[in-house]
Structures are given as structure tokens and as C-alpha cells.
């Protein structure tokens, strides 16, 4: 972000959140499409796959002149000959929407940079906290002492205007809001990315950056209010009773906010819900988890509070079936490709005292995580590595590659899956996945050389594709000391890597 801060006049545009003039700045397109500025994408002599800043300006003007703006993308037939290029509307409409997404992301990045620079002497570097695997050590530390959990499917806006209204609180530029409406209403199936993974619209495919920004901003808006409640309730619990005037003043400010939150008449009731007891909240994508040490009655209050909160403040209708109340000791959490649960492990210890012996039974709670094998095998089958029953098959589309490239591709997939699912308490599932990939690789190579798998493996020997099974030992040898008993043997416990920032494609079946 530093390399283009000098191009942007913060005092004029960004202080007032005026974004529309930046759409006509050529350097913005350069940063959005070519961060290294090695080549220019905006060329005046634009062809079918080239872009011209002048044409972009004309397109925006043409959009506003249309009585029915849906005519631009009404169909993708051969009749679409705007400016003499087939699908040119689609092309320029796409680039404007992507650059618009790049522009609205800049203020958040600048705020993050300024915040880190102002506190860099006080804040310890915590890049590992950005890893999605950091959630599971949190589970292991906190969930052993909790009773109930709410599994929440975050509702999505039923109308596009809700997203626009949310942005109005910080985007004061009316022209940008109008342009955003053009983008949103153009893609009528915009919410298929949330409601269905099978049918992905043009919007989610070609304008995923803009869509994800809008959806994340929508979720962040409601989470910011949620975190505000939690922080204030925590502050009240830690404040001594003697500071009565400060508490009265604080409650006065809370009552003032009743106008902002019209779904309740008594703000103290909301605060009580957060104080007794304090909940733990995590989220990834469209699913969140709220865990508490409270009773079943309290969790039901949480459930209907969230439903009313979404409906009254964000105009979102959420059915009660989208929030599940489960007891941690009897239920497994389905989260980020893992089944997580709290298990009770019993151990019997024999104690000898003089002539008497006693058997002491100890029960300890353990946070257990296992891999969701059926969806993972389904993902492998969808990628044509095996059939629906898990039997390995050859990857026919890779038979034209070199042998080394085929082995590297299979090995990369295997390493990524092993890396992501290394936190599993049971390793047998990973062995099965490795077996599928190993045999699929052998079948692919045998098909390429027009040989049988048995003859191919016999010719290469037992060392063929040994990296499929030795990758974890290689990683552990770098992490653990050489003289460690764990390093000398094969460690079967969970390992969470804090360098994973997203779910691998084959691991993402949600």
C-alpha cells in the first residue's frame, strides 16, 4: 500500500470517503491489475482483451444513459456487438467492477497500516494469529470448560439494497453508491455463492473480489456491534462496585443507544445476556460458533436474541433452524473440515498403601478432532482421483505431462492435505487419502506408458512415491529436537501449523 499512497490525496478524497473520482485515474487500474507495474494494461488501441481508459469512461456514461441498465448484460448472444466487439460489454463491465472493489479496499488497508505503525513499539508481531488453524488451539484451551454451543449459519441479505444501505454509513459518495447498484442488480443470482455451491453465478466467478468484500463488510458490521456488547459487559464485570457514578454514566450512554437498536426497550437486558456468562465466539466464512458455560435456557435466549437482532437491525430474516443448540459432551462440531468434540478419557491407577491396595479411576476431558472422510473422498472423486466409493482411478487429463510433473502434482496435493489435516487426532484417515492419491498417481503413469499398475510398481520398486508417506517425518524432524523421543519415533498426536490462511480446494467441501 505504501507505493501508491503518494498518488492519493487523502485530505481531499479519502477524508470524505469520495471514491468515484478515483475510478477515472489510470494508475488505479495499473495497481489493480499489475501491482509490479511491469506492463500497462490500459492501452488506447484496445482489442478484444485490452482495455482503454477512454472506453471505460464512455461505458460508465453509456450505463447511466440507458433507461434499462440490464440491457447491457441481458444476454450473451451474437447480437451483442457493442463498439464492434463481441462480449465487449461483459469485458469492460468486469474491469470496472473489479477496480471498484480494489478502490473500496484501500481505506481499510491504510487504516490497518497506520494502526500498526502507531503501535509497532507496543505490539508484538503476531502473523501466526492470522492462521485459520489458530482457532483449534483456542478450542482445546476453552471448550473443555464449556457446556453448550450454538452453531450459527449467518443469514445473507434477501435484498441487494441492504448491502448498499450498509455501505452508506461510511461511503458518502452518492455516485459510487449508484455505480455499486448497477453492479449488484446486474447479477441477479449474486447470492448463489452463499446459498448453493453447485450453481455459481457470473458475479461470483468474475467479480468474486467485489462480492467477498461486500459480504465480509456486511458480516463485520454486525460482528462489530456484537463485540461492542461483549467488551462493555466484560468492563462492567471488572469494575468495582464503588465506582457507582461511572457505571451510572455508562448506563446513560447505553440508554441513548436504544434509538439505534430499536429491537429492545431495555438495553440492560441485552447487557445482562452478555454478562451471565461470558460467551466465546469464532467464525469462518458464513458459519459461526457461540459457546458458553451457561444452561440450556440461556442458550435458547441467545438463539432468539440473535434472530431478533438480525431481523430488526439488519432487516434479515433468519429461520430458527439456522441456529442449532448442542451440548458439547454429546455433539461433534462440524467446522472447517473437522469433526471436533469433547471426549471423556478414563484411566485407572492402582495405589498400594501398606497391605491395602486401591483402584483410582480418573476421568479427563480431551478435545478430539477427526477428519470428515466422506466429504473429502467426495472431493477427490469430483476431481477424478477416485470414484464415489473411494477406489483410485487414473487422472486421464494429466497423461500428456512429463512423469516428473505428474508426480510433483500428486505430491503437492498430498502434502497440502497432510499439512492441513495434521491436527487430526486419528491419522488413519490421512493414510487412506494418501493411499488413494498414491495409487491414482501410479494408475495415471501406467496409463501413460500403456502398462499395468502391477508391472509399473514392480519395475520402479518399493521406493516409488515414498514422499507420500514420509512428509510428516520430514516436517517433524525440522520442528522437534533430534534427540527427542518423539522425533525418533512417529508422532501420532495433533499438530497445528500456524501458516495456513485458507482451506485447500480439495479440503473445502462446504
UniProtKB/Swiss-Prot annotation:
It is found in: Plastid, Chloroplast. GO terms for cellular component: chloroplast. Its main location: plastid. GO terms for molecular function: RNA binding. Keywords: Chloroplast, mRNA processing, Plastid, RNA-binding, tRNA processing. The keyword Ribosomal protein does not apply. One of its GO terms (biological process) is RNA splicing. Coiled coil: none annotated. InterPro entries: Domain_X, Maturase_MatK, Maturase_MatK_N. Usually encoded in the trnK tRNA gene intron. Probably assists in splicing its own and other chloroplast group II introns. Belongs to the intron maturase 2 family. MatK subfamily. This is Maturase K. It comes from Grahamia bracteata.
